[in-house]
Amino acid sequence: MSKFNRMHLIVLDSVGIGAAPDANNFVNAGVPDGASDTLGHISKTVGLNVPNMAKLGLGNIPREQPLKTVPAESNPTGYATKLEEVSLGKDTMTGHWEIMGLNITEPFDTFWNGFPEEILTQIEEFSGRKVIREANKPYSGTAVIDDFGPRQMETGELIIYTSADPVLQIAAHEDIIPVEELYRICEFARSITLERPALLGRIIARPYVGEPENFTRTSNRRDLAISPFAPTVLDKLNEAGIDTYSVGKISDIFNGEGINHDMGHNKSNNHGVDNLIKAMTSEDFKHGFSFTNLVDFDALYGHRRNPQGYRDCLHEFDERLPEIIAAMKEDDLLMITADHGNDPTYAGTDHTREYIPFLAYSPSFKCSGLIPVGHFADISATIADNFGVEKAMIGESFLDKLV
């Protein structure tokens, strides 16, 4: 019998808690990540008021310098620690895959200066359409269609862009490039980005409609991902007949592997919390695991180096946390963590190599406090231990510490 009948894991995308031991091996605009500290710098520069996460023990997590505006709790209601990454990467897929028990020794490729000419030329030759070279760089998905949508409507050229993650995205106006044609082009792009030097996690079709200054992305998005190279704890749960719920982009990150209930994409963090609560309160979800990604911290504020917006986004989540806790059953476990850092005060615009926070809460807890500093994959091992399934590649369970 499971110690916790249901487990809920929320990833606050990019909410790191201080530079990892190997952070200087990773750079941002030529600056090593060794001084990065997402939560620390937000707390120091613009203030951070997250009383509900503080109650769980966020301010108790060991650091060289305590979080300036998040006090330690003398009697927290949950367990807390920080976790270190072992994989060779600081992107979303690497972080999530390791959290589910894999060690990624060959990092995905990211293209901060845009994709090489060879890839663009191959796509042009396959599609018979030119690629707008000026869009070929990391770009906001809404900004790129605002900037190049009018040109695409005139010329039929492809808008190809990327982000901080290992993705190639193709935006196409549905009246100019039909959705099925866009899908075929994306399938070709997927076929040429399966190995180094262009090993990409996802190819994303981004259809949109409308007129200049009023473009809207449609629900016809399609993600062409690659599956994890080995079974994750999601697969182990699924094979054992245990329900697994995806909220947000989790299903995309794992290419649907090991997911048997997909709550769909989130329009925002708040929408994601709504979807999580909908899953938690469903009569069908009696036993199993839910996995939620809330990406606004990263996508809207981290890459754009906006500490005020990042802070406000954290405040917004913290205000919703009591609703999530209210949806829990007595024998549920809630876990809150991250997948990498993205210090909005740091050099460059890329992710930062950081520890991630880990908070755990259950209404059934008799004790609380700190658990030993561990690794990302310890989360997956704890999930496997709880449900009595085989763990994935790496990770050590701390289930016995949660009492």
From Swiss-Prot:
Species this protein is from: Streptococcus thermophilus (strain CNRZ 1066)
Sequence similarity: Belongs to the phosphopentomutase family.
GO biological process: 2-deoxyribose 1-phosphate catabolic process; 5-phosphoribose 1-diphosphate biosynthetic process; metabolic compound salvage; nucleotide metabolic process
UniProt cofactor note: Binds 2 manganese ions.
Keywords: Cytoplasm, Isomerase, Manganese, Metal-binding
Protein name (database record): Phosphopentomutase
Entry cofactors: Mn(2+)
Subcellular location: Cytoplasm
Keyword Isomerase in record: yes
Enzyme class: isomerase
Binding, Mn(2+) 2: 298, 303, 351
Record HAMAP family: Phosphopentomut
The protein's role, per its UniProt record: Isomerase that catalyzes the conversion of deoxy-ribose 1-phosphate (dRib-1-P) and ribose 1-phosphate (Rib-1-P) to deoxy-ribose 5-phosphate (dRib-5-P) and ribose 5-phosphate (Rib-5-P), respectively.
Reactions performed catalytically: 2-deoxy-alpha-D-ribose 1-phosphate = 2-deoxy-D-ribose 5-phosphate; alpha-D-ribose 1-phosphate = D-ribose 5-phosphate
EC annotation from Swiss-Prot or TrEMBL: 5.4.2.7
GO cellular component entries: cytosol
Pfam families reported in the protein's UniProt record: Metalloenzyme (PF01676)
